[in-house]
């Protein structure tokens, strides 16, 4: 691509969006290069990038081009193509959703759009419920406010496969961003019926499905637990509070500054419940209210973070691995106790999620399926079970990045479901005088102590992308040890491994049942390492983890 030429073409043609026009005029040479050195990558996660002007940015033109490519793909595969569209609280999410709707309608693709911002699982749900050809969610999940994205779902409600993504990308690449995109006015589309708002009955059906995930099976528990909940200025407020209230959890307090949708995320620059800073304000509220449980969901409400009081009365954050283990053990224990465990029960987790989950699953007679990083691969396994007539065999799926799903009604992680099930689990144990931290220690005593950590390293721009590739190649060299722990085996998923799709992921199995996974993020300019350490106690595990981390970081210099 001739960067200067493309920049001048945008100056001449990208005149419909005032923000794009203004930004184009202010770009210096370095910013022009970063904005135009490539087209924004489209993959199984759809699009994700910084909001702004250029081919490597999220804007009305790149969104329209992607929508045109998706429309062309759908018309080839469906006689009467249709799509569900949802959007979150991010900057320009509603604008991008309406642009996409206009393009689909102009191409004869029937549009069903949520009338207000909604959590991402409702798009997966509505796609299945309304039997549409695809779903689109405008979101960048938990990224900083400068990002937005465009997530695509197949007719099964699962994020698109690698093959579908490649086909859609091929359609997108045929297009000129200005000459080949059919656009349509959103309001005109609504008026002529090409665009329809999704009725409230679909939202109610979603909430009912979440409520049906309860595994109390008639047991009475104390639902008067004091809860503080924050949607982190995202989409979770209405569906989470409605579900909790309808299930009897009425003693709930909101984090006022984080309740209302706000794409600038004024109280937490990184609205990710995995990050302590994002939970800080909620923890302040929890202390003031003397709450029993703090819950927070990310902006598109597919992840849940929690904090609970320890014996000293201080609030302690639980990791995604810890919460997932607790939920798995609780759900399985309840199903076994009440005779509700399905035939050939299955638990699905990602390869970077702690292996103790598999031990717990085995204890309860569940078969574990390990998949690549990304909840779409968990959703894909649910689909395979459904094709075999065994959808009910799916008991639980989770990933270390705070994503959980207890049923097959959607094919993506669900923060509404996660928040409700965590409340139910908490109240169940509280009724018996047991804290979640007590239960966690019990699991460690049964299965052994395990520490799991995630480290992220940013590499911005075109130079950063090249550096990440070089680092991955260095890791593929003859690595003997990490932090004094010898490499027992290297699992390289690039050529495909254990029947899994090809993926740029390395997993080093180390001695003493330790491991480290290295992979580039699929949605951000980051390299991630996942370290797992087994030891006799927390202190010993932390020492080993620090040394493994130091060794890994030598390759990042």
Give the ranges of each region predicted by the language model.
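Phosphate/diphosphate-binding loops
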Residues: 115-178, 272-296, 325-331, 346-357, ...
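Short Gly/Thr/Asp-enriched flexible loops that form oxyanion-binding sites at enzyme active sites
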Residues: 95-104, 147-153, 302-321, 357-360
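Conserved phosphate/anionic-ligand binding catalytic regions in large, soluble enzymes, centered on
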Residues: 36-56, 140-141, 227, 231-243, ...
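Phosphate-binding and adjacent anionic-ligand microenvironments
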Residues: 287, 291-293, 314-316, 334-519, ...
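An N-terminal, well-structured beta->alpha segment
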Residues: 2-100, 107, 188-190, 195-225, ...
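N-terminal small/polar loop signature for handling phosphorylated ligands or for N-terminal nucleophile
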Residues: 79, 84-147, 246, 250-305
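Gly/Ser/Thr-enriched, mixed-charge loops and adjacent short helices
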Residues: 29-36, 40, 148-280, 284-286
């Amino acid at each position: 691509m001739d960067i200067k030429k493309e920049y001048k073409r945008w100056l001449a043609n990208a005149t419909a969006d005032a923000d794009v026009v203004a930004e184009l005029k202010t770009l210096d040479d370095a910013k022009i290069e970063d904005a135009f050195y490539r087209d924004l990558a489209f993959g199984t996660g759809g699009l994700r990038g910084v909001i702004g002007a250029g081919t490597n940015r999220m804007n009305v033109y790149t969104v329209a081009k992607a929508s045109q490519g998706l429309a062309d793909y759908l018309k080839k595969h469906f006689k009467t193509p249709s799509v569900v569209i949802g959007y979150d609280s991010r900057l320009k999410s509603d604008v991008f959703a309406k642009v996409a709707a206009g393009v689909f309608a102009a191409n004869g693709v029937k549009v069903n759009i949520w009338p207000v911002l909604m959590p991402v699982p409702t798009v997966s749900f509505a796609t299945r419920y309304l039997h549409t050809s695809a779903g689109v969610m405008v979101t960048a999940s938990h990224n900083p406010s400068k990002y937005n994205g465009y997530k695509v779902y197949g007719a099964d409600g699962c994020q698109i496969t690698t093959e579908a993504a490649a086909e859609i990308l091929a359609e997108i690449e045929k297009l000129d961003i200005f000459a080949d995109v059919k656009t349509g006015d959103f309001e005109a589309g609504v008026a002529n019926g090409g665009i329809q708002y999704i009725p409230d009955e679909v939202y109610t059906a979603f909430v009912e499905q979440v409520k049906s995930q309860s595994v109390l099976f008639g047991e009475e528990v104390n639902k008067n637990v004091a809860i503080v909940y924050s949607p982190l200025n995202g989409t979770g407020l209405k569906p989470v509070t409605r579900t909790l209230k309808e299930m009897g959890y009425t003693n709930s307090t909101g984090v006022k500054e984080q309740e209302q949708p706000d794409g600038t995320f004024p109280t937490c620059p990184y609205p990710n419940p995995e990050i302590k800073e994002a939970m800080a304000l909620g923890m302040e509220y929890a202390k003031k209210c003397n709450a029993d449980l703090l819950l927070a969901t990310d902006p598109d409400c597919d992840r849940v973070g929690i904090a609970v009081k320890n014996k000293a009365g201080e609030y302690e954050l639980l990791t995604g691995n810890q919460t997932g283990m607790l939920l798995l053990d609780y759900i399985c224990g309840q199903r076994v106790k009440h005779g509700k465990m399905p035939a050939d029960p299955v638990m699905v987790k990602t390869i970077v999620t702690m292996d103790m989950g598999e031990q717990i699953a085995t204890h309860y007679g569940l078969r574990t399926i390990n998949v690549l990083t990304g909840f779409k691969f968990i959703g894909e396994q649910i689909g395979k079970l459904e094709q075999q007539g065994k959808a009910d065999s799916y008991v639980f799926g989770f990933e270390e990045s705070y994503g959980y799903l207890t049923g097959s009604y959607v094919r993506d992680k669900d923060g509404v479901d996660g928040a409700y099930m965590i409340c139910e689990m908490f109240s169940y144990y509280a009724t018996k005088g047991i804290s979640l931290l007590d239960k966690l220690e019990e699991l460690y005593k049964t299965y052994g102590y395990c520490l799991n950590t995630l480290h992220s390293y940013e590499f911005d721009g075109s130079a950063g992308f090249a550096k990440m590739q070089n680092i991955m190649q260095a890791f593929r060299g003859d690595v003997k040890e990490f932090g004094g722990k010898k490499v027992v085996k290297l699992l390289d998923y690039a050529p495909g491994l254990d029947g899994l799709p090809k993926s740029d992921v390395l997993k080093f199995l180390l001695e003493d049942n330790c491991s480290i996974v290295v992979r580039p993020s699929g949605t951000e300019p980051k390299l991630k390492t996942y370290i797992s350490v087994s030891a006799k106690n927390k202190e010993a595990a932390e020492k080993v983890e620090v040394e493994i981390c130091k060794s890994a970081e030598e390759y990042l210099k």
